[in-house]
């Protein structure tokens, strides 16, 4: 999921984030990040569906 990041790298990143943002902000930051990723995936899915639909329409037009 995280490419070639190992456990020690993830712990280091989490530790740095904890120092920078503090323990009170991390849950809020995680929630915001999760929501942003979810919205991005949803938007990406919509774009793929639109492109697929446009391709089907173009193929039908060419075949007629």
Swiss-Prot record:
**Stretches that traverse the bilayer:** 10-30
Q: Which UniProt keywords apply?
A: Cell membrane, Membrane, Protein transport, Translocation, Transmembrane, Transmembrane helix, Transport
Q: How does it sit in the membrane?
A: Single-pass membrane protein
Q: Which Pfam families match?
A: TatA_B_E
Its GO CC terms are: TAT protein transport complex
Q: Where in the cell is it found?
A: Cell membrane
Signal sequence residues: none
Looking up HAMAP family in the UniProt record yields: TatA_E
Q: How does it assemble?
A: Forms a complex with TatC.
**Could you tell me which NCBIfam families the record lists for this protein?**
PRK14861.1 (NF011430), tatAE (TIGR01411)
**What protein does this entry describe?**
Sec-independent protein translocase protein TatA
């Amino acid at each position: 999921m995280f490419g070639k990041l190992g456990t020690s790298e993830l712990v280091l990143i989490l530790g740095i984030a904890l120092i920078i943002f503090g323990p009170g902000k991390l849950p809020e930051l995680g929630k915001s990040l999760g929501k942003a990723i979810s919205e991005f995936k949803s938007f990406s899915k919509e774009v793929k569906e639109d492109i697929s639909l446009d391709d089907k329409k173009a193929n039908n037009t060419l075949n007629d």
